[in-house]
């Protein structure tokens, strides 16, 4: 379903997407379009896109096609979701220690909607770091 969501094909397009949106959250999925985890994540993002249209705009970026941000944002994972609001990187404390991004596929649509809503509400209040509605620190059971 990734072909239904807008793709950004250059670093300039990514910058313009982040800079131009003033009222909504910019959600960018960085990854490889052909990767299995990215496909799962894109499916979830596609299914929630209409539900969060008033809060967020969702874009996809293939890190092989647009390598400009790979070092800056440490895009080494198979799928990475980052959030921006009014040209500011929004951070979310998921309990994983990495507050900059979500670097695993979230397959639950409601969880993703809740995260987007939490970040959007925090961003509107001027917060740069928000607390996730769910703690993902025990996501892996050892």
Curated annotation (Swiss-Prot):
InterPro entries: Dim1 (IPR004123), Thioredoxin-like_sf (IPR036249). It comes from the Eukaryota. It is found in: Nucleus. Keywords: mRNA processing, mRNA splicing, Nucleus. SUPFAM superfamilies: Thioredoxin-like. GO terms for biological process: mRNA cis splicing, via spliceosome. GO terms for cellular component: spliceosomal complex; U4/U6 x U5 tri-snRNP complex; U5 snRNP. Coiled coil: none annotated. It holds the Pfam family DIM1. Plays a fundamental role as a protein essential for entry into mitosis (G2/M progression) as well as for chromosome segregation during mitosis. May play a role in mitotic spindle formation and/or function. May have a role in the maintenance or establishment of the steady-state level of the APC complex. Belongs to the DIM1 family. Interacts with cut20. This is Mitosis protein dim1. It comes from Schizosaccharomyces pombe (strain 972 / ATCC 24843). The lineage of its organism: Eukaryota, Fungi, Dikarya, Ascomycota, Taphrinomycotina.
